[in-house]
């Protein structure tokens, strides 16, 4: 297991441009800090006033499209600092406000025992955009995201259910999915059931890729490759976070096609 100093050294490696070998980076800047300070009180008010049920036994507020930012990412007068993020501006959806409380995860009626064990033991590791549908939870590409950006909105201990990533997993996922789609016309890729190949590729990720814990810090952003396997660690005993819980705003703008999604 990585020690705290090893984690810090690894995180510092990713304060520059996204390394294609690992698939993620962390950046910081005054504009990111200003954006988080502007978004935080808005997010807190939304979460505390919301009637949306908390999942995972009352420990996770999903908060999809909860933040009322504009299409440029501006919120409460604060502009999204595209230059600090190192990204080209694109039209944005309302940000997700994901909030986790102490005790995460807990069993719930909406989740099977197997799904809960996977959440507890494997951080509910997943690939965004590959959505499970129907009673049999078969997966296809529904939301081909361009990239994923997460920005911490409040102070939280490193053990307060941090983001976790599997370095290099985007390459394994891309190779596996492309192999499954090789003989399918590109226009039909979004309709293909990719459940089995996805699960096989994810199993390989667990065996071959390094799991890295990425605690959120106000004033910093984490940029993930769209195909990177990632998840949320269980809340560590004794970890603390400001109310209403460890809070992160996420942007995942959608691309034009599945073929584009599977490009480099």
Question: Each predicted region: which residue ranges?
Answer:
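Short, Φ-rich (hydrophobic/aromatic) sequence segments
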Residues: 1, 152, 251-255
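Fe(II)/2-oxoglutarate
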Residues: 1-35
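Non-heme Fe(II) oxygenase catalytic core, chiefly the N-lobe of the double-stranded beta-helix
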Residues: 17-20, 34-211, 235
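Short hydrophobic/aromatic beta-strand or adjacent loop that forms the aromatic wall/cage
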Residues: 22-24, 146, 246-248
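Non-heme Fe(II)/2-oxoglutarate
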Residues: 178, 223-264
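Short acidic-glycine-tyrosine-enriched beta hairpin
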Residues: 210-223
């Amino acid at each position: 297991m990585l020690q705290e100093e090893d984690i810090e050294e690894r995180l510092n490696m990713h304060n520059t441009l996204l390394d294609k070998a690992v698939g993620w980076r962390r950046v910081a800047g005054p504009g990111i800090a200003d954006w988080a300070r502007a978004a935080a009180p808005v997010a807190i008010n939304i979460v505390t006033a919301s009637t949306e049920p908390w999942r995972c036994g009352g420990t996770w507020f999903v908060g999809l499209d909860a933040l009322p930012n504009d299409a440029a990412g501006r919120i409460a007068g604060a502009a999204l600092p595209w230059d600090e993020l190192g990204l080209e501006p694109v039209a944005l959806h309302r940000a997700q406000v994901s909030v986790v409380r102490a005790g995460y995860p807990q069993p719930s009626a909406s989740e099977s025992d197997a799904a809960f064990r996977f959440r507890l033991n494997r951080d509910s590791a997943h690939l965004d955009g590959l959505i499970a549908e129907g009673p049999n939870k078969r997966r296809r590409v529904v939301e081909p995201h361009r990239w994923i950006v997460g920005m911490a909105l409040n102070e939280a201990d490193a053990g307060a259910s941090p983001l976790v990533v599997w370095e290099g997993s985007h390459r394994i996922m891309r190779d596996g999915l492309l192999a499954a789609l090789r003989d399918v016309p590109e226009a039909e890729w979004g309709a293909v059931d990719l459940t089995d190949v996805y699960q096989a590729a994810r199993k390989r990720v667990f065996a071959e890729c390094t799991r890295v814990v990425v605690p959120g810090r106000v004033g910093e952003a984490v940029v993930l490759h769209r195909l990177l396997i990632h998840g949320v660690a269980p809340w560590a005993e004794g970890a603390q976070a400001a109310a209403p819980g460890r809070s992160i705003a996420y942007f995942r703008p959608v691309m034009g096609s599945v073929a584009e999604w599977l490009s480099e």
